[in-house]
Amino acid sequence: MIKRESYMKKIRPFINSDLVKVLTGIRRCGKSVMLDLIKQELLQQGVTPQQLISYNFENMSFARLCNAQALHDEIISQTQALTGKIYLFFDEIQEVKDWEKCINSLRIELNCDIYITGSNAKLLSGELATYLAGRYVEFVIYPFSFSEFIELYNTIQPNTSEADCFKKYLHFGGMPYLAALQYNEAACKQYLQDVYTSVELKDIVRRNNIRDVDMLERILTYIAANIGTIFSANVLSKYLKSEGRSMATETIINYVKACTDAFLFYQVKRQDIQGKKLLAINEKYYVADHGIREAVFGGNMKDINLILENIVYLELLRRGYKVSIGKLDTKEIDFICEKQDKKIYIQVTYLLAAEETIQREFGFYNEITDNYPKYVLSLDEFDMSRNGIIHKNIRDFLTDASI
């Protein structure tokens, strides 16, 4: 287990506060491990094991507690004889019907500190806004960053170079459990395929009552094949029609929304750089873990430019940036990244091997006249910065948390 200190730094200030700590993210990205890390810190601070009460609602042992009243009554009964603050941990809380009512009641009745995890973005919508508005703080957990991957991979293969680690990261992605499989090719592929199936069936099909699973599969395949490219539900509808299937554009949009709610894909809006407004159409999608894409659909090395974009995009989210795609007339900037009063522009490419590529990637910035930092990221080893535009190796960018 690695410490995932970047997340602990964010969570630590809220430990022992009366705000409910909500950890969200794709299934198997490490949310349960984060709960374990929090428990470890509490025990080191002198909290007794009896004060820590945990429930994992994927465990059939807790099936009888999957409604709000039963869970509430169980916890009240279990804590009656305890003194001092109680620490409550609920893993995959979305399995509990009306869980918001239970959590809010416990927050009021008990001297407690509450942590919950969930694998669906809808966790923070609907009735939650009524019961816990202003009383929770959310932390989105992602699969391993490249820096975390290096830390973990070197416990398995000590002294592996950063470049060799990156080759492994490109192939396997960042799902934490792969380390337990020693990054064995066949075992990892099987595991990632199973994670994908679990997300599809539990977090998309079942949660959204989707009946046409075959159509969902086609949409998932289409999005995965076209990550980092302009998405249009109308175009997808026409594509499906050419395949002998028919689906209304609105239904396609609902299916895609179900996929983003399950954190399988992330939607990125386009921003008009001149008008400084987000555009309502022609967004892009990136996959939560590029290793899942390779295991299920294949083709990552064939689409290396898009996979590198995907890796950089997820890293920007980890660092707390709000990310959009920049549109300037007919030109497009890969990422506009904003955080508080900080703003940077990023172009991502595989290699700056040809003069045409260099002119294209650096030339995008010619018409942007503000003074915010502008980056071109590639796998080239030599610094090719020019005209105030910073060139950086992608590996160096991923391991430089100061950006």
Predicted regions and their residues:
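Hydrophobic anchor at the beta1->P-loop junction of P-loop NTPases
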Residues: 23
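Hydrophobic positions on the alpha1 helix immediately C-terminal to the Walker A/P-loop
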Residues: 34, 38
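Catalytic cores of nucleic-acid endonucleases
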Residues: 326, 350-395
